[in-house]
UniProtKB/Swiss-Prot annotation:
This is 6,7-dimethyl-8-ribityllumazine synthase 1. InterPro entries: LS, LS/RS, LS/RS_sf. The active site is at residue 90. CDD domains: Lumazine_synthase-I. It comes from Brucella abortus (strain 2308). The gene is ribH1. Disruption phenotype: Cells lacking this gene are not auxotrophic for riboflavin and grow at wild-type rates in both rich and minimal media. But simultaneous disruption of ribH1 and ribH2 is lethal. Pathway: Cofactor biosynthesis; riboflavin biosynthesis; riboflavin from 2-hydroxy-3-oxobutyl phosphate and 5-amino-6-(D-ribitylamino)uracil: step 1/2. Catalyzes the formation of 6,7-dimethyl-8-ribityllumazine by condensation of 5-amino-6-(D-ribitylamino)uracil with 3,4-dihydroxy-2-butanone 4-phosphate. This is the penultimate step in the biosynthesis of riboflavin. (2S)-2-hydroxy-3-oxobutyl phosphate binds at residues 87-88, 129.
Length: 157
């Protein structure tokens, strides 16, 4: 996929990576991909860790409120985590609600968010999506956030 952002449109953007570390090894792989993509783009970033995917949208909201009160302002956000289907309905709730909340934040607050929360059937699928040499969803989410930063600037939002 080609991303619609040139270096000029997003000159040194500063992003917040919010990572859920429910599965530490998978979180490391996703974070590695996101950092590599942001480094390659010349972006700067902070990283904050939360317990699970449902806590990611709230953390982004906290960061937005903090910026309104003199804290760090971020140009965009990268959400990283893994939700693996289990034997209960919990997978559906976490998958649907984390995605819905990120979409709501993005639209209602006009912010750039790259969604790198994996929702998979098993650990094998998670690894295929997390590893940089495979699908590199961490890198994809970071590049998506950069693209959205560029589009927001292009439209003057």
């Amino acid at each position: 996929m080609e991303f619609l952002m040139s270096k000029h449109e997003a000159d040194a953007p500063h992003l917040l990576i919010v990572e859920a570390r429910f599965y530490d090894d998978l979180a490391d792989a996703l974070l590695d991909g996101a950092k590599a993509a942001l480094d390659e783009a010349g972006a700067t970033y902070d990283v904050v860790t939360v317990p699970g995917a449902l806590e990611i949208p709230a953390t982004i909201s906290f960061a937005l409120d903090g910026a309104d009160n003199g804290g760090t302002e971020y140009d965009g956000f990268v959400a990283l985590g893994t939700v693996i289907r289990g034997e209960t309905y919990h997978f559906d709730i976490v998958s649907n609600e984390s995605c819905r909340a990120l979409t709501d934040l993005s639209v209602e607050e006009s912010i750039a968010i790259g969604n790198g929360i994996l929702t998979v059937e098993n650990e094998e699928q998670a690894w295929v999506h997390a590893r940089r040499e495979d699908k590199d969803k961490g890198g994809f989410a970071a590049r998506a956030a950069l693209t959205m930063i560029g589009l927001r600037k292009k439209f003057g939002a």
